[in-house]
């Protein structure tokens, strides 16, 4: 499954919020430095979809706030 994600780094509170267009807004407290926000996004989405972290892959947007995420099923 592939989903579009909009990331908000350095948020006061973290969480995953579905948006009307079918994408997700992911708020993380980690800063967008040295991949810390990406790691926090992977952690948040793994928890949200109840899958292991290794099942969450950033396909596009590693350096931006808009990302294309792939969730691998059956891992």
For the regions a protein language model found, what residue spans apply to each?
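C-terminal structural segments of small proteins and small subunits
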Residues: 34, 42-75
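Short amphipathic
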Residues: 1-5
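A generic structural motif
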Residues: 11, 21-23, 64-66
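Solvent-exposed beta-strand sheet faces enriched in polar/charged residues
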Residues: 6-8, 27, 59, 72
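Compact, glycine-rich, soluble single-domain proteins
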Residues: 6, 19, 25-43, 47-49, ...
